[in-house]
Amino acid sequence: MAKKVALAYSGGLDTSVCIPILKEKYGYDEVVTISVDVGQPEEEIKRADAKAEKISNKHYTIDAKEEFVKDYVFPLIKANGSYEGYVMGTSIARPLIAKKVVEAARKEGAVALAHGCTGKGNDQLRFEAVFRQTDMDVIAPMREMNLTREWEIDYAKEHGIPVEVTKSKPWSVDENIWSRSIEGGRLEDPSFVPPEEIFEWTTSPEKAPEQPRVVDIGFEAGVPVSLDGEKMSGYAFVKKMNEIAGENGVGRTDMIEDRVLGLKARENYEHPAATVLRQPNSRPLRNSSLTRSELKFKKIVDDQWSELAYYGLVDEPLYADLNAFIDKSQERVTGIVKVRLYKGALTILARSSPNALYSEDLVSFDSQTIDQKGSEGFAKYHGFQARMYRKVMDKQ
């Protein structure tokens, strides 16, 4: 029986050179490649399919776009997911991709699982958190052979594998419907100004339209459901919002990120929809619909949720526990937020919710609904301990 290995395949340089390496260096008879569509460009999927058909023994392309948005992106929106300001598009996609690879591997009777991640990044951990739940061997050629990008380019050319990157522009790009990351090459130098050519989703703010774009975003139970009154599926909504926000220059991040291993890395991201959808949900509707105690506690929950998601630990029991609280807290986060997008800036213009705890009548300076004299007793004891402390210190 042929000795099979299942490879998580993106069509990029790293995973493409893994195919001959797994045969030549690791002795596998067949390499089954699995590409998972989580919103990459259609041409990228086609390019990966065409390449895999030529150099692998069997290839799968699995459409997981709607599943990705429904089961991974929407929970992130409800959790206000963010790691050091990063919207975690790559982070939340990896566990889903890994699970689809495992499913295909079992179908094929593979004895091993492989990925093309390096030993310096986070993705090796995210993939293997899922892979190592199986009894199959786990192989990481990039890490185990300590490969460099230049070596891979030469090796690919020797084996007739088409190479999109070059030694002078070795950008590594990872893309799904939620975000696009660009790293590597000269971008690793924090003092290097990224060339405009690395950006594809977002217009330079200087070249964005002169007229602002105003949109109404409808939310139900914490997730977006409509754009300017039009109901949309999750994937269609995020895709459309990427287009609108991106053409108005919204959604670029250039940051120094703390990786799981402790290394600091320079990362460039594009995430137009993520920038827009997290803001309206996290501020206007939540702040008007949840109590102060809920909001305070939810910040703690959101931070812990984000860390687990960034680490790829979505099968950790605590992750499910946190989601239970988040889902319950978001039941009342329903309403419409009006947003203005203009030359890279996002501004919340207005919000309305049937569940708002805000009362214009109660808070108005002109309202007599609340007798202001009633707060006098509260004011007398507000800061009481600080006053007592001051008296004690003044006596010393």
From Swiss-Prot:
It catalyses: L-citrulline + L-aspartate + ATP = 2-(N(omega)-L-arginino)succinate + AMP + diphosphate + H(+). It comes from the Archaea. The lineage of its organism: Archaea, Methanobacteriati, Methanobacteriota, Stenosarchaea group, Methanomicrobia. Its EC number is 6.3.4.5. L-citrulline binds at Y86, S91, N122, R126, S172, S181, E257, Y269. Gene3D superfamilies: Argininosuccinate synthetase, chain A, domain 2, HUPs. InterPro entries: Arginosuc_syn_C, Arginosuc_syn_N, Arginosuc_synth, Arginosuc_synth_CS, Arginosuc_synth_type_1_subfam, AS_cat/multimer_dom_body, Rossmann-like_a/b/a_fold. GO terms for molecular function: argininosuccinate synthase activity; ATP binding. Pathway: Amino-acid biosynthesis; L-arginine biosynthesis; L-arginine from L-ornithine and carbamoyl phosphate: step 2/3. It comes from Methanosarcina barkeri. GO terms for biological process: argininosuccinate metabolic process; L-arginine biosynthetic process; urea cycle. The keyword Cell inner membrane does not apply. NCBIfam families: argG (TIGR00032), PRK00509.1 (NF001770), PRK13820.1 (NF010392). Pfam families: Arginosuc_syn_C (PF20979), Arginosuc_synth (PF00764). Homotetramer. L-aspartate binds at T118, N122, D123. This is Argininosuccinate synthase.
